[in-house]
């Protein structure tokens, strides 16, 4: 389904499933990791199956230059850069669409890229509580309860993949990329 699509995955745990789903649909997903970052964990292996690995230190001048050289050939970029973080400025949508007007950028962060909570960090349990999901677990009249498997990361990743696919349909019709903020 997505044969011929090239995707750069710079996301953290919140967005890992998005890249996995798009890879499962046939896209060429390139996982970008800094040199020295361990890829030995079972969770890393599970979410990055069907992806190629590119070791690139995007915090350095050379790494940023090499990253910029990739963008014109990329269809979708998935990131989890928090607004205000050092590399987030390099991932600025206005700057990236200058490099590739057809690019689809999918940002997967706990509270989005804009608004009063943009830039806030949150764990899965905090996101489940904030979203009301904990009130759905446990006894009918009991206290909210955490579901043991991280739910919010999966929901965010699935929604990011759907957002990327929707933006790809839009791009096919218009020729224009867009920023999807999950």
Regions found by a protein language model. Name each.
Residues 1-37:
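Conserved small-residue-rich beta-alpha loop and adjacent elements
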Residues 8, 47-98:
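A structured beta-alpha segment of the ubiquitous adenosine-cofactor-binding alpha/beta core
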Residues 11, 33, 81, 109, ...:
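Nucleotide-sugar donor-binding loop of glycosyltransferases
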Residues 11-14, 59, 109, 153:
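Structured beta->alpha junctions
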Residues 17-21, 41-45, 161:
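Hydrophobic alpha-helical segments in the ANL/AMP-binding
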Residues 21-25, 73, 85-182:
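Active-site-adjacent "lid/gating" segments in soluble enzymes
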Residues 24-57:
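Glycine-rich phosphate-binding loop and adjoining beta1-alpha1-beta2 segment
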Residues 30-32, 54, 78, 104-106, ...:
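Hydrophobic/aromatic beta-strand patches that form the interior of the parallel beta-sheet core
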């Amino acid at each position: 389904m997505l044969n011929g699509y090239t995707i750069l995955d710079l996301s953290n745990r919140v967005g890992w499933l998005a890249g996995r789903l798009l890879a499962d649909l046939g896209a060429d997903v390139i996982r970008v990791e800094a040199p020295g970052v361990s890829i030995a964990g079972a969770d890393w292996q599970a979410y990055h199956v069907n992806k190629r690995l590119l070791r690139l230190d995007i915090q350095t001048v050379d790494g940023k230059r090499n990253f910029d050289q990739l963008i014109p050939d990329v269809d979708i970029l998935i990131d989890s850069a928090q607004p205000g973080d050092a590399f987030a400025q390099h991932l600025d949508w206005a700057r990236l669409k200058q490099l590739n007007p057809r690019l689809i950028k999918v940002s997967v962060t706990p509270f989005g890229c804009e608004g009063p909570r943009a830039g806030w960090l949150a764990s899965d349990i905090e996101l489940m509580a904030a979203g009301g999901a904990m009130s759905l677990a446990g006894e009918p009249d009991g206290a909210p309860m955490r579901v043991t498997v991280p739910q919010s990361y999966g929901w965010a990743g699935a929604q990011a993949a759907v957002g990327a696919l929707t933006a790809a349909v839009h791009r096919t019709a218009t020729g224009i990329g867009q920023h999807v903020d999950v």
